[in-house]
Regions:
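Conserved short-loop catalytic and cofactor-binding motifs
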Residues: 60-61, 78
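Short helix-coil junctions and helix-kink-helix linkers
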Residues: 76-84
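Alpha-helix initiation/capping motif
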Residues: 32-35, 83, 109
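Long, intrinsically disordered, low-complexity Ser/Thr/Pro-rich regulatory/activation regions
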Residues: 102-139
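NUDIX/MutT-family hydrolases
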Residues: 1-55, 64-76, 89-95, 99, ...
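A conserved acidic, glycine/proline-rich C-terminal tail/linker
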Residues: 87-88, 105
């Protein structure tokens, strides 16, 4: 049995020995890091499950603080899916008032490059594991 945790930031690894430490998931997937027994398969299964859940749940918001920009959310999708997404199409998919799963935080912006970026939060009543009305597609 294996458990998958999704965190905005990982704390210090604590275990019974000094050998416990965090690794980027790519290092495990590429075979750079050797894990005992079939633990690499556990990681691969967890990554595949997370990639799939991003399409039909609000799970990506669990990687972020409560208020975030659409660009930060897109970076989560791009990182987990290991692919580039069109900025405009992505913004429409997640922030559209009829189809999206985000709510703009009124009057809240952050400086982003040369402009102010609107802050968003997950739609009220929608948990990270909650199903989306309209899926977010990888392509």
């Amino acid at each position: 049995m294996a458990y998958l945790a999704v965190l905005p930031e990982a704390g210090a690894a604590v275990a019974g020995s000094a050998a416990a430490h965090w690794l980027p998931v790519r290092v495990v997937g590429d075979g750079e890091a050797v894990l005992a027994f079939d633990h690499a398969q556990f990681v691969a299964d967890g990554v595949a499950r997370t990639q799939a859940k991003l399409e039909y749940t609000a799970l990506a918001t669990a990687f972020l603080p409560p208020q975030f920009t659409v660009n930060a959310l897109r970076q989560v999708y791009e990182t987990v899916w290991d692919t580039r997404l069109d900025r405009g199409n992505f913004h429409r998919a997640v922030a559209d008032a009829r189809k999206g799963f985000l709510t703009a935080v009124e009057g809240e912006t952050v400086k982003a490059r040369r402009f102010q970026a609107q802050l968003f939060r997950r739609r009220q009543g929608l948990e990270a594991a909650g199903l989306l009305d309209h899926p977010v597609r990888r392509s």
